[in-house]
Amino acid sequence: MAHPGLPGVMFQPTVLVLAAGQGERFRAAGGHTDKLQSLLTTARGTRTVLEHVVAAVQASGLPWHVVTAQETRHHAVQGMGTSIATGVAATRHAPGWLILPADLPLVRPESLRAVAQALAQHVTVAPTVQGQRGHPVGLQALCRDELLALRGDQGARVVLQRHAPHLLALEDVGCVLDVDTPDLLAQAQRLAGPFAP
């Protein structure tokens, strides 16, 4: 389900929260639950990883859509590319998209707004944190057909190779710290501060 953004703001790309993955790396590394359902305690309370991401997206004021496994199940080939194409198809009239994997629980709302603002001036945008590329990656509607054609694990990398992204330096480790393993989840908890129960 798509959620509207702020009224009166001209350029509002839709944040696509990619939550259809299987979390295989997390389980293979010893995780006992779906990584998106793992708990993380921050100043805002104890929530699942997915709830932290959705809270940041909501706080950004941008329109958003969560791509779930249920939405992508009719595709023969699963993966990030399929999730992106499914999300773009569900929000095809958006002026652009911010692609946000749902395993980045520390991403800040202001980072989402910064990428959206830069996307108003550039066809594609990729945030960097201390030289490391991160998410969300922004793509204008000019890329719609290319995004709709993605399948499997292809992701948006092929589109970004055709449309070199504007690199936006941010100071938000939440843009680069995914929780693909239990160790990374523990690192995210340490960075979130002394809020653990």
Label every PLM stretch briefly.
Residues 40, 67, 127, 139, ...:
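Hydrophobic residues at beta-strand termini and immediately following loops
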Residues 2-15, 151-197:
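Conserved alpha/beta core of the MobA/IspD/sugar-nucleotide pyrophosphorylase nucleotidyltransferase superfamily
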Residues 3, 8-69:
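N-terminal glycine-rich phosphate-binding loop and ensuing alpha1 helix
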Residues 31-35, 40-44, 48, 74-82, ...:
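Residues at secondary-structure transition points
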Residues 21, 103, 181:
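Active-site glycine-centered loops adjacent to acidic/histidine catalytic or metal-binding residues
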Residues 67-76, 173-174:
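Short beta->alpha junction loops
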Residues 73-148:
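Conserved beta-loop-beta/alpha segment of the NTase-like Rossmann-fold superfamily
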